[in-house]
Amino acid sequence: GWLLVEKLRDGHATSVGAASGVVAGLVAITPACGALNPLGSLILGIIAGGLCALAVGLKYRFRYDDSLDVVGVHLVAGVWGTVGAGLLSTTTGLFYGGGFRQTLLQIIIALVTIVFSGVITLVLGLILKATMGWRIDKDAETSGIDQEVHAESAYDLNASSGGRFGGAFADAG
């Protein structure tokens, strides 16, 4: 699903898109894994990939910070997997003759989960703001938070990149 959206939207599919699509499928199947057959699982995963690829693109339009695409992948795929279980369940799913009841229950539980998670996140965020603050000071941001807090950098930007296998292997001795 993700690769198809990339191909249609951008003219090419990417390896990052392939990996993100796999993650989206795994997230989506998690709430539905005990209720779907293999075909339903494939359908759920393919749709999850497409929905998440579209959702990740929205962060640029709405200008919100989601550097790891947590909202676009985990929230969207999780909600789709929860609702999709109500549609594709082999015992109670709408598409298997189970009626709309299970789908409605799945929608309700997805909404309850979103509200619960939002409230808990807000409370924890306010506690953090009151105790530590949400932002680091400008000097720490300029020098790098890894250096400021841990006295080290996550990346050795001065490493040699020579040698057959790059700097890390060349310097390893």
Question: What kind of feature is each model-predicted range?
Answer:
Residues 1-173:
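Glycine- and aromatic-enriched membrane alpha-helices
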